[in-house]
């Protein structure tokens, strides 16, 4: 199977980096990219930010740390606000539990620190 042109264009625009699966499991990687970006992204007819946030939230919910990390790089590359990223992670807590969210929050903080993004973001609470 070949990587479809539309899937390739979207993948390169949003992520631009083949991961380890391309070397070890090329056929799987191609199928994944064709589905994720050639079908799912196109049919969702959503803006890039919304698509990435849904993908981040669902990947967090199932505990996919490796895929979350790959998506996270795309989120940063596409200038999605750190506040919005953390909000997705925070809001997952009541649904998937603190133990699972803690791993992803830690991963997020490591990336933010590496990129010199402040770890203490402006408070967003709206309840008292």
Predicted feature residues:
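Mid-chain, well-packed structural core segment of small domains
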Residues: 66-86
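Short alpha-helix boundary/capping elements
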Residues: 58-65, 97
